[in-house]
């Protein structure tokens, strides 16, 4: 399984700085657009204000992404074909190249 880390998350992990994993189904399935984008960006901003690097996690085209760019957050927030991916669906999501928001179980 390939995992893609954002530059910010990767740099923080290398430097030993704190990183906080955030699930993304609240963005993809839990809130209406555009409230979901606003919520996600605000949550990440609060993390940074506290000295923690946010690592929102989602699956894009079968690839696990740890730390999302704003465009990726907007994509899972708006795209009706975005799947809800729990730990149970991770293998299928990767094999079928799904894009999806991750539940807490898949995020962990």
Placement of each model-derived feature along the sequence:
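Short, hydrophobic/glycine-enriched beta-strand segments
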Residues: 18-22
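Short alpha-helix boundary/capping motifs
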Residues: 2-3, 37, 101
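Short hydrophobic/aromatic-rich motifs at helix boundaries and adjacent loops
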Residues: 13-17, 78-81
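Active-site mouth loops of central-metabolism enzymes
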Residues: 93-98
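Glycine-rich nucleotide/cofactor/substrate-binding loop typically near the N-terminus or early
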Residues: 24, 29-31, 36-92
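Internal active-site segments that recognize and position negatively charged phosphoryl groups
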Residues: 101-108
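N- or domain-start disorder-to-order transition segments that initiate the globular core
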Residues: 1-16
């Amino acid at each position: 399984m390939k995992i893609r880390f954002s530059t910010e998350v990767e740099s923080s992990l290398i430097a030993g700085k704190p990183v906080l994993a955030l699930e993304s189904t609240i963005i993809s399935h839990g809130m209406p657009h555009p409230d979901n984008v606003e919520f996600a960006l605000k949550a990440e901003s609060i993390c940074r204000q506290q000295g923690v690097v946010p690592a929102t996690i989602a699956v894009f085209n079968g690839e696990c992404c740890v730390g999302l760019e704003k465009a990726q957050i907007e994509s899972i927030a708006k795209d009706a074909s975005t799947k809800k991916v729990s730990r149970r669906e991770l293998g299928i999501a990767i094999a079928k190249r799904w894009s999806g928001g991750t539940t807490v179980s898949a995020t962990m």
